[in-house]
Amino acid sequence: MSIVSQAEQILDRVRAAGAEGDLIIDQGEALSLKAKDGALEEHKVTSSQVFGLRVIKDNRVGTAYSEAADGESLVALVDQALLNASYAAVEAHEKILANALKLETQDAQLSPIDQATVAEKIELALTIEARLAAKPMVKNVPYNGVQDSVGERRVYSTTGLEARSKARMMHCYAYALIESGDKNAMEGIGQAARRFVELDPDRLVDQAYQNTFDILQGAAIPSGKYDVIFDEEILPSLFNVFSMMFSGKSAKDGVNPMRDKLGEEIADSKLTVRDLPLDTDGFGYALFDDEGTPAQALCLIKEGALSSLIHNSMTASYFNSASTGHGTRGPRSTLGVGLHQLEIDAGTADDAALHAGAYLVVTDLTGLHSGANPISGEFSFGASGYLC
């Protein structure tokens, strides 16, 4: 039975029970390779498929999932979701959207056919480990790998929605352990691309080694006030820690300190932050959210002022607003909200002004979650980088 036929079978049973619902079907395939001491340590091939159903009946929401796809299991999936709904509290704002759109991403762009052989990927894994291990003072390369993964998501609903997205990611990474006397350090870096040929092992090895060597030679700097520039790899992690400030769900739950600050200045007037889900250069690209709402660009902070929160259909209903296309839900999880991919507008300072005087380039932060309180905004992180 085809995926479409299975979805129809599930949703027909939901309708027959007098309920409405939506169904997420996730499928994935992955290849994972790791090297150790010049030999292949891991060659893992995995595949997965999971059905995740949400039903709403009498304003009560129930969810259930199944990794099995036989007819009996799919019947049980519907029955379990309906049973769970019968015990749930009433949620007046959570509905299945009246959305009959047909949405589909472009496979040729986001999930291109892989021209590289498994042998070539194995050779890449061995090459990365060998080249990094051969660098001066490198004791070993404890963490390294080459991965090729393809993920596909389909979303169907009782109102006629049919949405499909598919994406491929090639990923390689390496961490070096360097020892010199009684000092040691371990650092690394990774790369991601949609095509195997876009991976650059020479650059990966050189950067991983240089990062580790620099940390080995590093020392604490005197306490004081420093101008700070965040490395482009660490800045997204910092923003992610405080992403709750944009959440319509946390605002609904009463734990978002920005709930009543729309239109107010909350940051430097030079800062403009946007969520750009339709930028195909990023791996956060999304044509639609997990409710099937079309994704669109959204300005979150405009010249320092909070301009929008992100909403799914439930939080939008609660605030008498419209969904911004930021609904999140997995086959095993309930409805939430989440960002796609943030972009900061370019500033006006030129390089000369930006790098004038002493400044600290932060390349790593530790304690990002344990050291941060996204409600109060207080934080205390360990930081490392370069004093320039």
Label for each model-derived stretch:
Residues 261-388:
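Dual-mode signal for accessory low-complexity, basic/Gly-rich regions
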